Amino acid sequence: MKQILVSIVIPTYNRADFIGKTIKSVLNQTYSNFEIIIVDDGSTDNTKEVVRSFADSRISYFKKQNEERAVARNYGTEKAKGDFITFLDSDDVFLDFHLAEAVSFIKAHISDLEIFFQPYYLLLEGQRKNKIPQKIIPIAKSLIKKGNFMACQGVFLKNEVARNNSFNEDRLLSGSEDYELWLRISRKFKIEYNPVYSSILIDHQGRSQHYRDTSLLILRKELFLKYTLAHGYSKPEFRVISSGAYSYIALHLALQSDNTAWSWLLKAIDCDLRILFTKRVFVTIKNLFLAKFTGIKGS
């Protein structure tokens, strides 16, 4: 059997302060047959110089106009030569055995493997946390019930699967484009699970999911539901997905002490009563009461 080539697509935008660490984490892999495809989505800082400081023939750098990360990931996919493709944001890192574990899993399931997921740690305030829900098999059902627990860095797709199932390039969907793809792709393929924690998602204030413009967040989630509706989910399944989207909006509004969070929370509960028993709803209600009775904003 030939040695498996893995393509790592790294979209980036003004991440000169982070991307060096990201690249090093890939170059430090114990498995060495990979290519790094860095797609610079119109950076105005010195990202290019940081990338060029790594003299490694496995690194390819492409700069294009700013069109958001879905377009950048799709661009990188078109350039990828690997048997399998994975994605890594330019402020996250692989542990040094990440690719070795993935390739071992590929070899063990090579006859029918199309897409699989390896879990990751969340680095929050300097501490590694396990944020992946328990009992996520089958993944397709868990994506409906538990929301998006699949960060791009843990997803490996067969080259032709990635090429034929691209990220939605609607710019206003940015931030939910990965979840929309996982739901769409799970309707076509079985998503396998390799339960080895092998990468780190680093939480920081610059991350794009830290929304301050709630109107854009609401629009994004409404677009997400519009696109997801077209994937052929049953009415009960779609109501569960909708409940997750509405509760997400409610949480972010509550964290800003915005009382309109209540209306979104009620919509979430109306779609799926079980959402009441989740940590997200508990935190939402706690922050709304804190703001009302103490004036303290949540965090």
Residue ranges and their predicted role:
Residues 142-144, 197, 201-205, 210-236, ...:
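Catalytic core of nucleotide-sugar-dependent glycosyltransferases
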Residues 118, 134-215:
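Conserved nucleotide-sugar donor-binding catalytic segment
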Residues 97-130:
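Conserved donor NDP-sugar-binding/catalytic core segment of glycosyltransferases
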Residues 1-25:
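N-proximal low-complexity "stem/linker" segments adjacent to membrane-targeting elements
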Residues 24-33:
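Short, acidic, metal-binding catalytic loop of nucleotide-sugar glycosyltransferases
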